[in-house]
UniProtKB/Swiss-Prot annotation:
Belongs to the methylthiotransferase family. MiaB subfamily. Catalyzes the methylthiolation of N6-(dimethylallyl)adenosine (i(6)A), leading to the formation of 2-methylthio-N6-(dimethylallyl)adenosine (ms(2)i(6)A) at position 37 in tRNAs that read codons beginning with uridine. Binds 2 [4Fe-4S] clusters. One cluster is coordinated with 3 cysteines and an exchangeable S-adenosyl-L-methionine. NCBIfam families: miaB-methiolase, MiaB/RimO family radical SAM methylthiotransferase. It catalyses: N(6)-dimethylallyladenosine(37) in tRNA + (sulfur carrier)-SH + AH2 + 2 S-adenosyl-L-methionine = 2-methylsulfanyl-N(6)-dimethylallyladenosine(37) in tRNA + (sulfur carrier)-H + 5'-deoxyadenosine + L-methionine + A + S-adenosyl-L-homocysteine + 2 H(+). This is tRNA-2-methylthio-N(6)-dimethylallyladenosine synthase. One of its GO terms (cellular component) is cytosol. Residues 142-377 form the Radical SAM core domain. [4Fe-4S] cluster 2 binds at C156, C160, C163.
Length: 448
């Protein structure tokens, strides 16, 4: 039986795509996954180009795979994702031992590309943008319990000045309303309890409803999904403040299964920086969204993405960012120093801020966010949290799962119950706060 190894870089969209690659090659060629590239017949790197560091890791991994291919000449190496979309033929020029290069929108052609490589002996490159065709050619997910990603749209039409996504994944295109509901219903019928809706700007969703001329927005989609039997929890990522409508806020008042955790990237707290980034909203408008959300969900936890050291960022700009973070009380968030990406407008902006200053600002921001996150964790001590069990923790002994606020929680369960608990919702009493996780005890009477 042929074995497949996939290494995934970057966002949840890439994780979803990697799962689809595995499903596709299992359906077409009977391939099974391995966690060791040395044992694989096919190795795929699903890449991310959002920051230079992630891109560098890909080429570092390719260097190691070159050595592996010397010992396994029949090993097939494929590069997919956003670096593949951005670099295309250059990947093969840089690493001629790569066999297949494919973009996010052509992963459904992966089996054909592999077959052509084997038949012709020629490397294959397909980084075209056939809109959302791939969803018509991918097999159903094999996920049977727990949580599952469902991609509802692809691409981005916002063109923020620093971001490569519109160039690597194309413009925004939504899947049809009926297709999304069919996929969700199929997953729920197999035992999946939590649905995570995915898109680069997921709340910009506008899906065609059957043969009608009507279009469903994101709020309506959620209202329909919650009615599907078996769906117990709904999340979504990543949303954009510009598309965070009052209709979507109103859904939070009607759909308790929509979690009280929101990841909403703000990027900065200074209007000057937000304008330079071409984000399309002001700091005040972002704050207004959060205040409205907390009015309908007082227990809402908020995480975000932040960029420091953007070209032109002054100390006053940075202080405005810190003030916003203090005011809105963010949970665990992603904080980065600006990474200029080739082909984006921001890459050409004059940047005279020393790296040491940027690094100090990053450390200051991280300390503030981590302090706020720790306070949120401390407030959970003694609480009983509804937790969806994902599987064994890294120690191989404890189980781990996620609470509604996306916190990872570890707990011990009797050995004979472990397999039965995976994929289930259970109630856990929080007993200890660690650096990045919580520990708790299973409340025996409350297994759902």
């Amino acid at each position: 039986m042929k074995k497949l190894y996939i290494k995934t870089f970057g966002c949840q969209m890439n994780e979803y795509d990697s799962g689809k690659m595995a499903d596709l090659l299992h359906a077409d060629e009977g391939m099974v996954m391995t966690d060791r590239p040395e044992d694989a017949d096919v190795v795929l790197l699903n890449t991310c180009s959002i920051r230079e560091k992630a891109e560098d890791k890909v080429f570092s991994d390719l260097g190691r795979l070159r050595e592996l291919k010397k010992t396994k000449p029949n090993l097939l190496i494929g590069v997919g994702g956003c670096v593949a979309s951005q670099e295309g033929q250059q990947i093969v020029s840089h690493a001629p031992y790569v066999d297949v290069v494919f973009g996010p929108q052509t992963l459904h052609r992966l089996s054909d590309l592999i077959a052509k490589r084997r038949e012709t002996g020629l490397f294959q490159v397909d980084i075209s943008f056939p809109e959302i065709e791939k969803f018509d050619h991918l097999p159903a997910s094999r996920q049977t319990r727990g949580s599952a990603y469902v991609s509802i749209m692809e691409g981005c039409s916002k063109y923020c000045s620093y971001c490569v996504v519109p160039y690597t994944r194309g413009e925004e295109v939504s899947r049809s309303f009926d297709d999304v509901l069919t996929e969700v219903a199929g997953l729920a019928s197999k035992g999946v309890k939590e649905i995570v809706l995915l898109g680069q700007n997921v709340n910009a969703y506008l899906g065609k409803m059957g043969d009608r001329q009507e279009i469903a927005d994101f709020a309506l989609l959620i209202e329909y999904i919650v009615e599907i039997p078996g769906v117990e929890r709904i999340r979504f990522t990543t949303s954009h403040p510009k598309e965070f409508t009052q209709r979507l806020i109103d859904v939070y008042t009607k759909v308790p299964k929509l979690v009280s955790h929101l990841h909403l990237p703000v990027q900065h707290g200074s209007d000057a920086m937000l304008s330079a980034m071409k984000r399309g909203y002001t700091a005040l408008e972002f704050k207004s969204i959060i205040r409205k959300m907390r009015a309908v969900r007082p227990d809402l936890t908020l995480s975000s993405d932040f960029i420091v050291g953007f070209p032109g960022e002054t100390e006053a700009d940075f202080e405005k960012l810190l003030k916003m973070v203090e005011e809105l009380n963010f949970d665990n968030s992603f904080c980065f120093i600006f990474s200029p990406r080739p082909g984006t407008p921001a890459a050409n902006l004059h940047d005279d801020t020393p790296y040491e200053v940027k690094l100090k600002r990053l450390q200051t921001l991280l300390a503030l966010v981590e302090s706020q996150a720790n306070q949120i964790s401390q407030k959970m001590l003694g609480n009983i949290e509804r937790v969806l069990i994902e599987g064994l923790a890294k120690d191989g002994i404890n189980l781990q799962g996620r609470a509604e606020n996306n916190r990872v929680i570890h707990f011990t369960a009797p050995a004979q119950n472990i397999e039965n608990l995976i994929g289930q919702m259970v109630d856990i009493r929080i007993t200890e706060v660690l650096n990045y996780t919580l520990r708790g005890k299973l409340v025996e009477a409350y297994v759902h």
